[in-house]
From Swiss-Prot:
UniProt-annotated stretches for the region Activation loop: 796-818
Protein name stated in the entry: Macrophage colony-stimulating factor 1 receptor
Membrane-related topology note: Single-pass type I membrane protein
Swiss-Prot/TrEMBL catalytic activity: L-tyrosyl-[protein] + ATP = O-phospho-L-tyrosyl-[protein] + ADP + H(+)
Segments of skewed composition (Low complexity): 928-940
C-alpha cells in the first residue's frame, strides 16, 4: 500500500444526527507523520463541501452526498483544521477535524505571511503547530527575538494560532511564533501585521486665513492644510475653480497624517483676487472649505453703525453706542470723544472691542450706563490707519418727564396763575379747578378743565430740556378751591397744586414734607460727620500692616500646616553690632512701613574691615506690631542661616534705639529691572518684546526721558504702571541713576546661559528655604537681587515697598496680595505650601525668559482672571524661552500641587540645561566692536574680564557696557 500508514476510512451507511455532516475518522484531532497517506471522508444528507488550509497535496473526490479528501504524501503544509459543510442545510451544520503532520524539521505551518486588520479588531496570526506536544512552550515575539510591546494582549489556539486582541496602530510589526523543542527555541517564518486606522470620514481641513485683504504689490500667503488618521488621501488648492500646482509638505503629528500646501505671492495683483478653495478627499468622501482674497488699490477705512446716529434715551437709563469698523491695514489708533455741549470732560467708557466677521472688521462699543443730564450731547468715534482719519458722530438727547411750578402774579393788572413746565419732549399743559384743598384734583370734584394746546416756549436748545409757560387768568380766587397745573409728555407727567389760603396764597408741591432750614442744616452736618467717621474707620481697617511673608513650618498633616510663631524664636546676641560703627548714606528705597538705607559698616566680621551694607529700618511713626514684625524678620533670617542665593543677614542693632537689620548690599539691584534694562538696551524703548498693538509697549516704565533709581536693595524705578517704586525719583546727582549709568552697568551682553544662571540660582535658593521648612509666599523677580558676579539672591522687601500703590498687589479682603504670582490654592483657599512657592517660581521663570514682562499680559485681575486660573489657563511660551524651559513652567503650573516638581528636581534639570548649553552653544553673543582688547577675544575671555570688573561696578557704578544688538540675542 506504499510507504506510510494507510488509514482506511469506513463509509458511513446511516445518517448520524439531524442535518449535521459526519467526518470519518470520527476524532477531533489526527496526528500523522510526514509522507503518510491520509483520507478524510464527509457524508451528509445532500452535497457537502470541504474548507481548510490551502495545500497542493490534496485530491478531492465527490460522490453524491459524500466527499473524500485524500493525499498519499502528507507534509507539514497539510497541518490545519478541515471543516465539512452542507451548503443546502438551512441550519448551517458542520463538522471539523484538525490534522497534525508531525515534522520535527518544520514545527510551524504559517498559513499567511501578512495579516491586515483595522484598529481595535482582533488580529489572528495563523501559525499552526505541526506537533501538539509543543503547545506548552509556545510564545509570540517580534522579529529577531525582540519582546512584544507593553500592554500587548494575546492568546494562543493550537488549531488557529496567535490572536492579538484589540490591535493598535502602533502594533503594526513583523512577528514570529516561537516553540521550545529539545530545550531550544524554534521560530516560524515572519508574519507582517498591518493595523489600519479606522477612517471616520473625509480629512479635516484648515484654510488660513479665513479672509485676506492686500494692497496691490504687497506679499500674501495662503495655507491649505489637511489631516487624517490614514495617509491615503489627496489635497489640492484651487483658485476660481482652477487647480494650482503647489509643492506639498507632509508630516505626522498627534497620530494624524498632515499634508500642507502653501501659496506664497510676493507681489499680489488684481488677477490674484477671488475665491480660494482647499479640497481634500479619501475613501470616505470629499471635504472642502473656501476663503475670499480681496486685492485693493490703496488702504481703506470705513465706519458705519446699525444704529440711528440720532439717539433719544430717558435719563437714568443706559445706552451702548456701537460702531462697525472695516479697515486695511489695521487700526493705528482709535478713541471715543465727547464733543459737548455740557462739559469739557471726556467719557470714561467701558470699551468692548470684538472681532466680528473676520480680521478686517471690528465692532467698538461705548457703554454709557445710568445716563446723567450732563452726559447728553455729541459722541464721536475716531479711528486712524494708513488710509487716514475717519469719524462717526452720534447725537444723544435725553428724555425727561416734566417738572412743574406755579406762581401767582399780576399781569396787566389782572390776577394770573403762571405755570412753568420743563422736560423733553416738549410737554403739553392742562389746568384743572377742583373743590376743596387737595394735592391732586383726582381726589376731589373737578369743577373746570382748561387745555393749553400752544403754551409759550421759553427755551429750546439742542440736548436741553424744553421749557414752556402757560397763563391762567383768574379774576377772583375761590379760597376753598384748588388750581392744578398738569404737564405731560411721552416720558411721564408732573403737576403743581395752587391752594389759596387767604387774601394771599401759598403753594406746595405734592407729597413734600416741610423742614425748617436750621433742622435741615443740622441733620446734614451730622450725617456728613458720621460718614466721615465711618470712612476714616474703614481706611484704618483697610490699611495693610507690615508682616513678614516668610513662614517656617513646624508640622503639617495633609494641607493643614502649623507655622512657628517667629516672635518665639530665639535671638542670638552674636548678631549685635554697634550703632556707632554704621555710617549711613543715601536712602535706597522707602515704603509704607519703613526704608532701606545704604551704609558703610566698620569692623563687621573683621576688626579693620570696611563693608558696604544695606540697613532695614522702620519709620519713626511705626506701630508696636510693625516693630514686632521687623524683629520677627530678624529672627527668621538668623534661624535660617547663610546661603549663597539668599540675601544674608550680616548683623543687627536691637539695643539703644530703633531696630536695624543689616543685610548684604546688592549692587545690581533687582532682577526685574535688570532684565528690563537689558531688553531696552537690546531692542530700544519702542521695540521691546511684547509691543502693544495699539502702539504702546508693555514696558511702560521704560522711556528715554526717565531717570532710574539705582536698585541696590531691590527697589524698582519710579513711574511704572505695573511695578510701583517705593520712593520718588530724585533728580540730584547723588541719588539719580541715569540711563547712561545703566548702559555701563554690565560689560557683557545677555545670553541664554545668563537666564539659565539666574533661574538655577533662584531654584537653589528656594531649595535651601524648602530644606529649612520655610515658605516664601512672594516669589517674584522683584524680590530677587543681583550682586557681584551676577549672583542671584532671594529676599523679601515688603518693608520698603509701597504696596498701597503697587498694582502687582491686589486687594483681597483686608490684605493686598500678589495674585498674579499666587497658586490657585493660595488665591481661593488661603493655603500656602512649598508647592505654592513652586507655582510662583514658574511665574518668575516666565518673567526671566520674557525679559521682565508683567505676567498674564493684557489680562486684568477680575472675575475672568480668577476663572482662567481656576480652569487651568497657562501663559504662552515666552519669546526667549527654549521649549524645555517652558515645559518646566508648565509643570510648575499644574493645578494639583502634588503634581508639581520639587525645587531639588528643578535645580537638577536646570544644571543639566546649563551644561548642555555650554556644550552646544546654540545661542551666542557676537563680540562688541566697542569693547577694548580687540574683537578677537573669545567668549570665555570676555566672561572672565566681565567677572573681574563686577566689584568695580558695584562700588563705582561706572563701567562701560556695549550696546545690545538684536542679532546678539540668538536665543529668541
Amino acid at each position: 500500500m506504499g510507504p506510510g500508514v494507510l488509514l482506511l476510512l469506513l463509509v458511513a451507511t446511516a445518517w448520524h444526527g439531524q442535518g449535521i455532516p459526519v467526518i470519518e475518522p470520527s476524532v477531533p484531532e489526527l496526528v500523522v507523520k510526514p509522507g503518510a497517506t491520509v483520507t478524510l471522508r464527509c457524508v451528509g444528507n445532500g452535497s457537502v463541501e470541504w474548507d481548510g488550509p490551502p495545500s497542493p497535496h490534496w485530491t478531492l473526490y465527490s460522490d453524491g452526498s459524500s466527499s473524500i479528501l485524500s493525499t498519499n504524501n502528507a507534509t507539514f503544509q497539510n497541518t490545519g483544521t478541515y471543516r465539512c459543510t452542507e451548503p443546502g442545510d438551512p441550519l448551517g451544520g458542520s463538522a471539523a477535524i484538525h490534522l497534525y503532520v508531525k515534522d520535527p524539521a518544520r514545527p510551524w505551518n504559517v498559513l499567511a505571511q501578512e495579516v491586515v486588520v483595522f484598529e481595535d479588531q482582533d488580529a489572528l496570526l495563523p501559525c499552526l503547530l505541526t506537533d501538539p506536544v509543543l503547545e506548552a512552550g509556545v510564545s509570540l515575539v517580534r522579529v529577531r527575538g525582540r519582546p512584544l510591546m507593553r500592554h500587548t494582549n494575546y492568546s494562543f489556539s493550537p488549531w488557529h494560532g496567535f490572536t492579538i486582541h484589540r490591535a493598535k496602530f502602533i502594533q503594526s510589526q513583523d512577528y514570529q511564533c516561537s516553540a521550545l523543542m529539545g530545550g531550544r527555541k524554534v521560530m516560524s517564518i515572519s508574519i507582517r501585521l498591518k493595523v489600519q486606522k479606522v477612517i471616520p470620514g473625509p480629512p479635516a481641513l484648515t484654510l488660513v486665513p479665513a479672509e485676506l485683504v492686500r494692497i496691490r504689490g504687497e506679499a500674501a500667503q495662503i495655507v491649505c492644510s489637511a489631516s487624517s488618521v490614514d495617509v491615503n488621501f489627496d489635497v489640492f488648492l484651487q483658485h476660481n475653480n482652477t487647480k494650482l500646482a503647489i509643492p506639498q509638505q507632509s508630516d505626522f503629528h498627534n497620530n494624524r497624517y498632515q499634508k500642507v500646501l502653501t501659496l506664497n505671492l510676493d507681489q499680489v495683483d488684481f488677477q490674484h483676487a477671488g475665491n480660494y478653495s482647499c479640497v481634500a478627499s479619501n475613501v470616505q468622501g470629499k471635504h472642502s472649505t473656501s476663503m475670499f482674497f480681496r486685492v485693493v488699490e490703496s488702504a481703506y477705512l470705513n465706519l458705519s453703525s446699525e444704529q440711528n446716529l440720532i439717539q433719544e434715551v430717558t435719563v437714568g437709563e443706559g445706552l451702548n453706542l456701537k460702531v462697525m469698523v472695516e479697515a486695511y491695514p489695521g487700526l493705528q489708533g482709535f478713541n471715543w470723544t465727547y464733543l459737548g455741549p455740557f462739559s469739557d470732560h471726556q467719557p470714561e467708557p467701558k470699551l468692548a472691542n470684538a472681532t466680528t466677521k473676520d480680521t478686517y472688521r471690528h465692532t467698538f462699543t461705548l457703554s454709557l450706563p445710568r445716563l446723567k443730564p450732563s452726559e447728553a450731547g455729541r459722541y464721536s468715534f475716531l479711528a486712524r490707519n494708513p488710509g487716514g482719519w475717519r469719524a462717526l458722530t452720534f447725537e444723544l438727547t435725553l428724555r425727561y418727564p416734566p417738572e412743574v411750578s406755579v406762581i401767582w402774579t399780576f399781569i396787566n393788572g389782572s390776577g394770573t396763575l403762571l405755570c412753568a413746565a420743563s422736560g423733553y419732549p416738549q410737554p403739553n399743559v392742562t389746568w384743572l379747578q377742583c373743590s376743596g384743598h387737595t394735592d391732586r384734583c383726582d381726589e376731589a370734584q373737578v369743577l373746570q378743565v382748561w387745555d393749553d394746546p400752544y403754551p409759550e416756549v421759553l427755551s429750546q436748545e439742542p440736548f436741553h430740556k424744553v421749557t414752556v409757560q402757560s397763563l391762567l387768568t383768574v379774576e377772583t380766587l375761590e379760597h376753598n378751591q384748588t388750581y392744578e397745573c398738569r404737564a405731560h409728555n411721552s416720558v411721564g407727567s408732573g403737576s403743581w397744586a395752587f391752594i389759596p389760603i387767604s387774601a394771599g396764597a401759598h403753594t406746595h408741591p405734592p407729597d413734600e414734607f416741610l423742614f425748617t432750614p436750621v433742622v435741615v442744616a443740622c441733620m446734614s452736618i451730622m450725617a456728613l460727620l458720621l460718614l466721615l467717621l465711618l470712612l476714616l474707620l474703614y481706611k484704618y481697617k483697610q490699611k495693610p500692616k507690615y508682616q513678614v511673608r516668610w513662614k517656617i513650618i513646624e508640622s503639617y498633616e495633609g494641607n493643614s500646616y502649623t507655622f512657628i510663631d517667629p516672635t518665639q524664636l530665639p535671638y542670638n546676641e552674636k548678631w549685635e553690632f554697634p550703632r556707632n560703627n554704621l555710617q549711613f548714606g543715601k536712602t535706597l528705597g522707602a515704603g509704607a512701613f519703613g526704608k532701606v538705607v545704604e551704609a558703610t559698616a566698620f569692623g563687621l566680621g573683621k576688626e579693620d574691615a570696611v563693608l558696604k551694607v544695606a540697613v532695614k529700618m522702620l519709620k519713626s511713626t511705626a506701630h508696636a506690631d510693625e516693630k514686632e514684625a521687623l524683629m520677627s524678620e530678624l529672627k527668621i533670617m538668623s534661624h535660617l542661616g547663610q546661603h549663597e542665593n539668599i540675601v544674608n543677614l550680616l548683623g543687627a542693632c536691637t539695643h539703644g534705639g530703633p531696630v536695624l537689620v543689616i543685610t548684604e548690599y546688592c549692587c545690581y539691584g533687582d532682577l526685574l529691572n535688570f532684565l528690563r534694562r537689558k531688553a531696552e538696551a537690546m531692542l530700544g524703548p519702542s521695540l521691546s518684546p511684547g509691543q502693544d498693538p495699539e502702539g504702546g509697549v508693555d514696558y511702560k516704565n521704560i522711556h528715554l526721558e526717565k531717570k532710574y533709581v539705582r536698585r541696590d536693595s531691590g527697589f524698582s524705578s519710579q513711574g511704572v504702571d505695573t511695578y510701583v517704586e517705593m520712593r520718588p525719583v530724585s533728580t540730584s546727582s547723588n541719588d539719580s541713576f541715569s540711563e547712561q549709568d545703566l548702559d555701563k552697568e554690565d560689560g557683557r551682553p545677555l545670553e541664554l546661559r545668563d537666564l539659565l544662571h539666574f533661574s538655577s540660582q533662584v531654584a537653589q535658593g528656594m531649595a535651601f528655604l524648602a530644606s529649612k521648612n520655610c515658605i516664601h509666599r512672594d516669589v517674584a523677580a522683584r524680590n530677587v537681587l543681583l550682586t557681584n558676579g551676577h549672583v542671584a539672591k532671594i529676599g523679601d522687601f515688603g518693608l520698603a515697598r509701597d504696596i498701597m500703590n503697587d498694582s502687582n498687589y491686589i486687594v483681597k479682603g483686608n490684605a493686598r496680595l500678589p495674585v498674579k504670582w499666587m497658586a490657585p490654592e493660595s488665591i481661593f483657599d488661603c493655603v500656602y505650601t512649598v508647592q505654592s512657592d513652586v507655582w510662583s517660581y514658574g511665574i518668575l521663570l516666565w518673567e526671566i525668559f520674557s525679559l521682565g514682562l508683567n505676567p498674564y499680559p493684557g489680562i486684568l485681575v477680575n472675575s475672568k482672571f480668577y476663572k482662567l486660573v481656576k480652569d487651568g489657563y497657562q501663559m504662552a511660551q515666552p519669546a526667549f524661552a527654549p521649549k524645555n524651559i517652558y515645559s518646566i513652567m508648565q509643570a510648575c503650573w499644574a493645578l494639583e500641587p502634588t503634581h508639581r516638581p520639587t525645587f531639588q528636581q528643578i535645580c537638577s534639570f536646570l544644571q543639566e540645561q546649563a551644561q548642555e548649553d555650554r556644550r552646544e552653544r546654540d545661542y551666542t553673543n557676537l563680540p562688541s566692536s566697542s569693547r577694548s582688547g580687540g574683537s578677537g577675544s573669545s567668549s570665555s575671555e570676555l566672561e572672565e574680564e566681565s567677572s573681574s570688573e563686577h566689584l568695580t561696578c558695584c562700588e563705582q557704578g561706572d563701567i562701560a557696557q556695549p550696546l545690545l544688538q538684536p542679532n546678539n540675542y540668538q536665543f529668541c
